[in-house]
Amino acid sequence: MAKNRRDRNSWGGFSEKTYEWSSEEEEPVKKAGPVQVLVVKDDHSFELDETALNRILLSEAVRDKEVVAVSVAGAFRKGKSFLMDFMLRYMYNQESVDWVGDHNEPLTGFSWRGGSERETTGIQIWSEIFLINKPDGKKVAVLLMDTQGTFDSQSTLRDSATVFALSTMISSIQVYNLSQNVQEDDLQHLQLFTEYGRLAMEETFLKPFQSLIFLVRDWSFPYEFSYGSDGGSKFLEKRLKVSGNQHEELQNVRKHIHSCFTKISCFLLPHPGLKVATNPNFDGKLKEIDDEFIKNLKILIPWLLSPESLDIKEINGNKITCRGLVEYFKAYIKIYQGEELPHPKSMLQATAEANNLAAVATAKDTYNKKMEEICGGDKPFLAPNDLQTKHLELKEESVKLFRGVKKMGGEEFSRRYLQQLETEIDELYIQYIKHNDSKNIFHAARTPATLFVVIFITYVIAGVTGFIGLDIIASLCNMIMGLTLITLCTWAYIRYSGEYRELGAVIDQVAAALWDQGSTNEALYKLYSAAATHRHLYHQAFPAPKSESTEQSEKKKM
């Protein structure tokens, strides 16, 4: 349903506006304003307000229009919302030469204020989508998006990375709001956040993101690089230049940024003045802002938002409508709500982890080398008790080595890496036990000896049971004997050829299970006892051939 009415806008003027709703029921007309669509909860989880998102982006007037999403992101308390409100003034009054407004008019729109505490949380979008005609005549929908500042005292690194990455993934124009300069840590944070966003997206041969604009606020060196886009372009070219004399780490940061965005530019903006910075009651009136700032602001905003500057949102080369943007918003937030992505770490945590892992690797390598000297490939078989004693000595030595290395993170942080070291050493010890046992001739002969014993026992039992008329049992024993004989031949072939190793391992496991039913002596004792007890039955079942003289003597007796 659509309604027309004259509303007083945020800057005191009247304008004719059309409000659209997808709902069938009539809703009261609401004044345009910021709407929270991404909420960061107290437990640092994320929630998307789909109802609000649908209400704004799926209205009949805009849902099938190709969308231009403009976002401002960066550190907290650096004037992002303040800048967004000047963007709103331009969007509402862009046909006017003096779009910046009256000098006594307070600045309203997205919530902002002076001070040191954060104002915006999550992601907010302006409830009114602006329909703009591009130079080619195509009408596009322009969405303005304000984001939570990074690195405030209440947000984790994951919170900051998620909000920044999500806004970069959704936007077609991402303004990276910086203060005074582009420092190396700014580039490293950008690398981290964009990589966190790229992880959540499908693999593509195209650059994953579109336009990145470095907006350097409070620029203090106009004598080196002039205010505006020309000075910014020269400044950024110098900052992002990759040269052979740079450290590899610095080169990688710059290459990564270039690989992520199709277009990168920069604008240098002067300081708004001392009154803005120090007046606790500053409400955005132009009369309190320095003229140099206003002059460059009048250049910046049209440079960002004029029809010819607007970049339509594209994903994998396909232009996205407002309807499609809603679906991508939902899909991306599901990824960040889950645990598929690794949690980003602070530089201290990442360094401490690398430091501890290096100590684990060194201690483990020391254990490995000394165990090789004791029971390596060319060393003879070592008694199991002696091997265990050496293992315990070397394990203690490796633990001392780990504890002696200077590590970042403290004792508590290192404790789990110590446990990891002990676990890995115990796993290595198990491998050394198996390797040492393979050198034992009795251990190596365990499988054929076990199979031979099975063959012999079943042969004897088959003979005895066949003699006393238990043909079924005799046949069963003969079958087992035949299968065991085939298994023995198969095992011998596997050991000789090296083929079908998995089958050989199964045969060894079965033989080991039979072996473990009793010691070798017990098995032999039982075997000999059975043979001695039933020897006469065996001879009766399988009589030896008689000589001719014996047969003749028996005939005479008869």
Swiss-Prot record:
Record-level Gene Ontology MF annotations? GTP binding; GTPase activity; GTPase-dependent fusogenic activity; identical protein binding
Its predominant location is: endoplasmic reticulum
The record ties this protein, via InterPro entries, to: G_GB1_RHD3_dom, Guanylate-bd_C_sf, Guanylate-bd_N, P-loop_NTPase
Every copy of the GB1/RHD3-type G domain together lies at 64-309
Coiled-coil annotation reads 418-439
Q: Which family does it belong to?
A: Belongs to the TRAFAC class dynamin-like GTPase superfamily. GB1/RHD3 GTPase family. GB1 subfamily.
Role description: Atlastin-1 (ATL1) is a membrane-anchored GTPase that mediates the GTP-dependent fusion of endoplasmic reticulum (ER) membranes, maintaining the continuous ER network. It facilitates the formation of three-way junctions where ER tubules intersect. Two atlastin-1 on neighboring ER tubules bind GTP and form loose homodimers through the GB1/RHD3-type G domains and 3HB regions. Upon GTP hydrolysis, the 3HB regions tighten, pulling the membranes together to drive their fusion. After fusion, the homodimer disassembles upon release of inorganic phosphate (Pi).
Question: What is the designated name of this protein?
Answer: Atlastin-1
Gene name, per UniProt, is ATL1
